């Protein structure tokens, strides 16, 4: 395979991989917010859970809104780097909540590996968006 074809395929694979990660992260945030917190537990149930952790009940509504809006913006490819970074405190809170449960997701209350993975994925999405922005000053970035 020629070097130019290999380079073109490599660039396309990188863009496709970035878009796939961004899209998947957006779907995760949306479903975690709407399906889990709103439809499964309900607003009152989610607020009650937050209160049981010693957090103000209103925090639940902020987290639901942040995950729903952030997920939609990631799916729409709007302000990707800033959205991915802005959602890190939400994931940090989730990591804090699950930290005492152990590593495995099947642990009572869920493990902390999933929030940690999502933190890393969000940082990668933000870094990729910054990299695309920096490498394409003369055109609108595909995943900015």
Give the ranges of each region predicted by the language model.
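Membrane-interface interhelical connector segments
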Residues: 38-53
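Extended, low-polarity transmembrane helix blocks
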Residues: 1-38, 58-65, 69, 75-144
